Amino acid sequence: MAGGAHRADRATGEERKEGGGRWRAPHSPSPPGPRGCPVPLKAAAQSLCRKPTWGRYCTLLLFQRKLEIYSVELHAATDIKKKEGRDGKKDNDLELKRNQQKEELKKELDLDDHKLSNKELETKYGTDIIRGLSSTRAAELLAQNGPNALTPPKQTPEIIKFLKQMVGGFSILLWVGAVLCWIAFGIQYVSNPSASLDRVYLGTVLAVVVILTGIFAYYQEAKSTNIMASFCKMIPQQAVVIRDSEKKVIPAEQLVVGDIVEIKGGDQIPADIRLLSAQGCKVDNSSLTGESEPQSRSSGFTHENPLETKNITFYSTTCLEGTATGMVINTGDRTIIGRIASLASGVGNEKTPIAIEIEHFVHIVAGVAVSVGILFFIIAVCMKYHVLDAIIFLIAIIVANVPEGLLATVTVALSLTAKRVAKKNCLVKNLEAVETLGSTSIICSDKTGTLTQNRMTVAHLWFDNQIFVADTSEDNLNQGFDQSSGTWTSLSKIIALCNRAEFKPGEESVPIMKRVVVGDASETALLKFSEVILGDVMEIRKRNHKVVEIPFNSTNKFQLSIHQTEDPNDKRFLLVMKGAPERILEKCSTIMINGKEQPLDKSMAQAFHTAYMELGGLGERVLGFCHFYLPADEFPETYSFDSESMNFPTSNLCFVGLLSMIDPPRSTVPDAVTKCRSAGIKVIMVTGDHPITAKAIAKSVGIISANSETVEDIAKRCNIAVEQVNKRDAKAAVVTGMELKDMSPEQLDELLANYPEIVFARTSPQQKLIIVEGCQRQDAVVAVTGDGVNDSPALKKADIGVAMGITGSDAAKNAADMILLDDNFSSIVTGVEEGRLIFDNLKKTIAYTLTKNIAELCPFLIYIILGLPLPIGTITLLFIDLGTDIIPSIALAYEKAESDIMNRKPRHKKKDRLVNQQLAVYSYLHIGLMQALGAFLVYFTVYAQQGFRPTSLFHLRIAWDSDHLNDLEDNYGQEWTSYQRQYLEWTGYTAFFVGIMVQQIADLIIRKTRKNSIFKQGLFRNKVIWVGIASQIIVALLLSYGLGSITALNFTMLKAQYWFVAVPHAILIWVYDEMRKLFIRLYPGSWWDKNMYY
């Protein structure tokens, strides 16, 4: 019944030109003509198989509400992996060939089974409707076409994933360094078996570092990406089939084309089925189409479009009620759900913005490291250094430039943020998705279940010639309309009695709006509405016993029942009816006003039509209600009612009122949309629902602002034709899937660029992908929200897919990068804020990490060029990168936002880089050089205290490193043996290490903010920073005093006074950075701001 009311309302809505507010592309081509040459589905599939270099990218044009679309489209749109030609001409030829192959694969699949008679179906599929297939024939078809199952995609072996972590990022450089160390030791060992093991230690440490960070990264980022698995879970396990004239229960995957199957309420549809008979059958296509309204099914051909006709049911959808018998016409990958599954798995995992930024950063740092290393390798060779020594210098320079612990730190920071947002009901499957959400500039949101509550709710009532507003909040408890009228008493009774829905037993203690109901969406809404206002509806029905009923059907478009009344003094039967408003009104001759019947004259009929059009224009589903007390003399208590012959009156009834329902928006969504708008994020609605409904919901949640108008709105207000309106005057657009199909990519780009507020209605999965790709062509970072199977391809294609955790299908959850555990769109706003914060904090982490690179690099450059004793060893550097700096780097992930980041525009993924020029210059050439000077100050102090003045150290390297010189004099005439010099050198290592560590404490504190003063931000708001500082000091103390005796580590016990030599430099760094921030705040937009703000 409700489905019929919806269809009646939809029909009237489509006739109203102004209702949809649709956007029309300039110079849109005329509707498509006759179909191209149809090819069988099997042939199309085989054409794909003949091109093994093509990954399948099957797209499905679903549920277009226009007569011109008669078929399902199959497209191929993935890369061809062939060897590239060596010259540009070959590349161009290859690209041309790719495009030609794509065009060849754009074939339409002719589906005409819904038009065929039963006899023609039997002939086409070689079966018998009564006896079914023979077991022998079924076995042949199963062997020929394969099982009724979705083909899982090829999986990357876990070992390959692990090995990629072992050689990705900086790892390959460190592996090369480790191997060179071992080779250098091997060459040296051949000529000198007593050679030092330092190079072995260094190579081993580098290898261990790579392995540990690789294992950590593999563990942190491992996730399931098998989209097909979720689809397979949706497959029914068993199916009732007729074979050899016998009814059998077989595994659903053994079904073949031509099988005769039976389905009943509660079953999942086991394949694409052409119905042969149906009794009260309704199906739920919401997981496929996004529409929550049950769809009635029958055996009759009702629409040219096979996706619109009522005599086809689709694989994996659910039969809600009734029974049906049908013939299998498609199985497995050839079903509609199979094509969507292929589409979802065919869409490649796009690199996230933060992954691109990290890759960009790795390329920069690796390029600098290798370039500088090779340059100084050449310099060392030219300066007569031994080649093996020059190789070690090369390795040392690379190690000094590469922040070995940074990628692990980034992963930990992302993990911590993911845990933080999980507490706010956002489950992150892909760690990088946290930052991606923060950089989002467009959110393409599904309507049903995402912006709305995914449940039909009574929104308005019309009785006594007035429209009343009902409470559509989650609890429905604040019904403020007038309930004292006698008309309401009659209307409420009809609503309660003319309803087949029932609460599931045992739900009495559950809040009414959360109870499970057996019945379709509209009936459920009416039942809960009645229960809230009237109390126990089941008890009311018991007191008003039902004697006969006519369920809704598409022919009558009404539901009728006759009841005994609870009044013992009134022996009359009560006839109650509801259905499509215009059909109900036709059956009435009177109307109830203020509890009394009066003639239904032209003025009241006009009032009815005005109210009906107003409610329909809001995108709401409207039902009409009427009743009639049967005369006791004509219909005594013993009267035998017959629903078949309808031996009771169905005309001259009394019209009581209208009631409209809508899937209402979530209460928190309008505020979330407002926050998105203030954050510079465009929210686009993409739904499969009717444009009038979509527009109404968009206006109610703020996607279309109150003062924004579509072209149609302007035309209506100015009373002119739509073609006369300047499209630039409209701020909003409502575009149907049919209009979108006729748009070129350029027209779609124009639409997305020119309209800040857009709603796409009646879209297919293919079109959702087209919309996402169009947004990405605008250089936007696109987030897509959704909960249905139909959303999964777009969820996977988007920069970040956000699925609903409660109502979301398994397919949507597996395709998504993030899951909203509370299904609350407003949780996305929390995710955006956390994403922006983590990007800011990653900037601070990288700036903090890069700063010390100059201080680590300079010792080797000075050593090579000026011949000083080596200020710091390579292994010692690793203890800075992986020892003292790891926890402080992670601590920056806990830093609070320093300003209102939600009033900032989204970052441009190509311009606003994680590592920009300002960050590199300030970290390397400002703070980095200060750190290097401070560390050298500690180094020279240690040597001076031991008798070597700074000037005497220059060009001392050759004598210093000689193993045979045991009487080297210092500036005070003291003689130093080779071992004593080695121990002093290790003390210098330790001093240089401590000098960097002390200044890194200051560097850590200044990185708390990029613009605000430290004092405004608060020194102690982030307590984890102080844990990081404590860890730096503890690790340094442990290395110096606890592990100083271990020769391989090259540390010694450092005197206490040396720990404080670099403190003045640390203070200078703090003061310098505070001055930088002060000038940025004082002179926004100035040269200083542009060059010193990173």
Swiss-Prot record:
* Positions annotated as active site in the UniProt record: D446
Q: Where is this region: Disordered?
A: 1-37, 286-305
- State which Enzyme Commission number(s) the record gives: 7.2.2.19, 7.2.2.13
Q: According to the UniProt topology, which residue ranges lie Lumenal? A: 179-201, 379-390, 863-872, 937-988, 1042-1056
Chain positions recorded as Mg(2+) binding sites: D787, D791
Question: Which CDD domains does the UniProt entry name for this protein?
Answer: P-type_ATPase_Na-K_like
- Which Pfam family, just one, is annotated for this protein? Cation_ATPase
* Cytoplasmic side, ranges: 56-157, 223-358, 409-842, 894-913, 1009-1022, 1078-1094
The protein's annotated catalytic reaction(s) are:
K(+)(out) + ATP + H2O + H(+)(in) = K(+)(in) + ADP + phosphate + 2 H(+)(out); K(+)(out) + Na(+)(in) + ATP + H2O = K(+)(in) + Na(+)(out) + ADP + phosphate + H(+)
Single Gene Ontology BP annotation: potassium ion import across plasma membrane
InterPro entries on file:
ATPase_P-typ_cation-transptr_C, ATPase_P-typ_cation-transptr_N, ATPase_P-typ_cyto_dom_N, ATPase_P-typ_P_site, ATPase_P-typ_TM_dom_sf, ATPase_P-typ_transduc_dom_A_sf, Cation_transp_ATPase_P-type, HAD-like_sf
From the record, give the transmembrane residue ranges.
158-178, 202-222, 359-378, 391-408, 843-862, 873-893, 914-936, 989-1008, 1023-1041, 1057-1077
Q: Which GO terms describe its molecular function?
A: ATP binding; ATP hydrolysis activity; metal ion binding; P-type potassium:proton transporter activity; P-type sodium:potassium-exchanging transporter activity
* Phosphoserine found at: S1013
Topology of this chain in the membrane: Multi-pass membrane protein
Question: Which keywords accompany this UniProt record?
Answer: ATP-binding, Cell membrane, Hydrogen ion transport, Ion transport, Magnesium, Membrane, Metal-binding, Nucleotide-binding, Phosphoprotein, Potassium, Potassium transport, Sodium, Sodium transport, Translocase, Transmembrane, Transmembrane helix, Transport
Locations of Pro residues compositional bias? 28-37
CC annotations in GO: apical plasma membrane
Note the SUPFAM superfamilies from the entry. Calcium ATPase, transduction domain A, Calcium ATPase, transmembrane domain M, HAD-like, Metal cation-transporting ATPase, ATP-binding domain N
Q: How does it assemble?
A: The X(+)/K(+) ATPase pump is composed of a catalytic alpha subunit and an auxiliary non-catalytic beta subunit. The alpha subunit pairs with the beta subunit of gastric H(+)/K(+) ATPase ATP4B or the beta subunit of Na(+)/K(+) ATPases ATP1B1 and ATP1B3; this interaction is required for the formation of a functionally active pump and its targeting at the plasma membrane.
What does this protein's UniProt record list under function? The catalytic subunit of a H(+)/K(+) ATPase and/or Na(+)/K(+) ATPase pump which transports K(+) ions in exchange for Na(+) and/or H(+) ions across the apical membrane of epithelial cells. Uses ATP as an energy source to pump K(+) ions into the cell while transporting Na(+) and/or H(+) ions to the extracellular compartment. Involved in the maintenance of electrolyte homeostasis through K(+) ion absorption in kidney and colon. In the airway epithelium, may play a primary role in mucus acidification regulating its viscosity and clearance.
- What name appears for this protein in its UniProt entry? Potassium-transporting ATPase alpha chain 2
Q: Which gene encodes it?
A: ATP12A
